[in-house]
């Protein structure tokens, strides 16, 4: 049996070229002012939809989604603070982080002491602009560098936020790639942050390129890519797609996977789901500095997929963990913070995880009484791989453990050998009549 698709190998080739393309796509998306609703997320989905087939869904304001309701739609055109000289001291056109995301419209004049309660800064990083939101409480405000605050004169200011908060809809995008099985692999990433590169243009770009990589291939599983607003988007999708959710067999939430930090994988609520084991195995061999974290109900949209009513096998793949790096939710999470090499490596890791899941099967040894004589079949020598001894060991491990009950991932975990070399061994032994696949039919 030939490997279905060498995704990991494909992503590894021309890593520099692939990384440059990923970074360029992030650069194109970076200027857009996104939020959990509105034209910013629509524009973002439109750009993703030029690269992969994307179905757009609009869910009206007020729609009940479990214990929540779809919020009003927010759009912004301009915002500024200017002094009596009509010069803007804070300008939304220079950074869309300057406005408290979801601010209600305001246009008034006020003295500095009245304005200050509406200003947000990071004193410990005085040149950085914070990212703040007020999704579910109507308010307005500006986020500015602390040095900007210190430079404000005690005078009257004109304050303008040219925005709308009114009935509309919540927007999300889906890319569905059918496989032989109706069982699904889910890839989810939040698309609601404005000009923040690692969180989460990294996830959006890698997911888009991953869908391109999978598109047109002969797939075992069907794949569903979700580009959604954080929290409320996942809740909305789950409330509208309970039957679809029941078909999810593996899943990854992708976030903050473009910085230079080590990989972190947060396990699903199930703790030992196949995707948890697959991610841990790939990271062990591809990124030895990676850490596997236990499940926690704090984080990204894995919180919703892993809620007890669904309890889906969905983990979260990151590099630096949210909230642990100073650039998190600040203007320092910019395109310079995003590494082209890291993006390419993240794409390769994701592809390798899915390659493992696609090829993880159980086999039956057709010559189970003592070892079959490999030499007379030409199987007791290397086929030209980088580790001849490992190739022989892989064949012996696969033969010994192929009792119809152990999968290749089981064998990989027990032997310490990379999954890929065991999969190659299983294919070779199958071609020589020594193994038979025993997996039940899919879908």
Each predicted region: which residue ranges?
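N-terminal hydrophobic/helix-forming segments and targeting peptides
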Residues: 1-443
């Amino acid at each position: 049996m030939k490997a279905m698709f060498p995704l990991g190998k494909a992503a590894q080739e021309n890593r520099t070229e692939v990384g440059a393309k990923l970074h360029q796509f992030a650069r194109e998306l970076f200027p857009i002012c996104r939020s959990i609703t509105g034209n910013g997320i629509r524009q973002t989905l439109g750009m993703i939809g030029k690269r992969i087939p994307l179905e757009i869904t609009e869910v009206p304001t007020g729609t009940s989604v479990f214990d929540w309701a779809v919020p009003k739609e927010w759009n912004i055109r301009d915002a500024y603070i200017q002094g009596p000289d009509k010069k803007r001291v804070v300008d939304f056109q220079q950074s869309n982080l300057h406005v408290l995301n979801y601010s209600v419209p305001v246009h008034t004049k006020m003295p500095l002491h009245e304005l200050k309660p509406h200003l947000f800064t990071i004193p410990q990083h005085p040149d950085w602009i914070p990212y703040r939101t007020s999704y579910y409480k109507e308010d307005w405000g500006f986020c500015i560098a602390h040095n900007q605050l210190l430079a404000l004169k005690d005078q009257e200011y004109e304050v303008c936020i040219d925005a709308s908060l009114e009935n509309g809809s919540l927007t999300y995008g889906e890319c569905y790639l059918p496989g032989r099985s109706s069982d699904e692999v889910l890839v989810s990433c939040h698309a609601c942050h404005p000009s923040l590169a690692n969180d989460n243009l990294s996830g959006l770009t890698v997911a888009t390129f991953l869908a391109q990589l999978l598109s047109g291939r002969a797939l075992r599983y069907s794949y569903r890519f979700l580009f959604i607003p954080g929290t409320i988007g996942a809740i909305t999708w789950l409330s509208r797609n309970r039957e679809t959710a029941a078909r999810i067999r593996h899943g990854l939430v992708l976030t903050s996977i473009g910085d230079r930090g080590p990989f972190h994988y947060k396990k699903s609520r199930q703790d030992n789901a196949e995707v948890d084991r697959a991610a841990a195995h790939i990271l062990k061999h591809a990124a030895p500095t990676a850490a596997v974290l236990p499940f926690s109900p704090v984080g990204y949209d894995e919180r919703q997929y892993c809620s007890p009513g669904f309890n889906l096998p969905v983990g979260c793949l990151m590099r630096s963990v949210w909230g642990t790096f100073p650039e998190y939710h600040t203007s320092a999470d910019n395109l310079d913070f995003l590494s082209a090499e890291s993006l390419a490596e993240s794409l390769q890791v994701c592809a390798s995880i899915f390659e493992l899941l696609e090829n993880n099967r159980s086999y039956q040894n057709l010559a189970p009484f003592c070892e079959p004589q490999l030499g007379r079949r030409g199987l007791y020598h290397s086929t030209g791989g980088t580790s001849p001894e490992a190739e022989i060991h892989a064949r012996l491990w696969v033969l010994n453990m192929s009792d119809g009950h152990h999968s290749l991932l089981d064998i990989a975990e027990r032997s310490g050998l990379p999954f890929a070399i065991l999969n190659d061994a299983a294919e070779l032994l199958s071609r020589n009549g020594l193994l038979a696949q025993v997996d039940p039919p899919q879908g």
